[in-house]
């Protein structure tokens, strides 16, 4: 049983390490995506009316 416990501990550690690596990568990608989304949102705010009209036309069609 002691051996099994040691193995489970090592496995959980390896999994935690992998998750940490994925999180660091996701953080970098998220920051890039957020910056892009913010720029798109700013443009959408300026053209909010035109976008609404287009969506209404699309729904009618």
UniProtKB/Swiss-Prot annotation:
The keyword DNA-binding applies. It comes from the Eukaryota. One of its GO terms (biological process) is sperm DNA condensation. The keyword DNA-binding applies. GO terms for cellular component: nucleosome; nucleus. GO terms for molecular function: DNA binding. Keywords: Chromosome, Developmental protein, Differentiation, DNA condensation, DNA-binding, Nucleosome core, Nucleus, Spermatogenesis. InterPro entries: Protamine_P1. It is found in: Nucleus; Chromosome. Transmembrane segments: none annotated. Testis. Residues 1-61 are annotated as: Disordered. Belongs to the protamine P1 family. Protamines substitute for histones in the chromatin of sperm during the haploid phase of spermatogenesis. They compact sperm DNA into a highly condensed, stable and inactive complex. This is Sperm protamine P1.
């Amino acid at each position: 049983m002691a051996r099994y416990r040691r193995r489970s501990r090592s496995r959980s550690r390896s999994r935690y390490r992998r998750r940490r690596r994925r999180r660091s990568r996701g953080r970098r990608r998220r920051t890039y995506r957020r910056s892009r989304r913010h720029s798109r949102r700013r443009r959408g705010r300026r053209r909010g009316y035109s976008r609404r009209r287009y969506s209404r036309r699309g729904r009618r069609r």
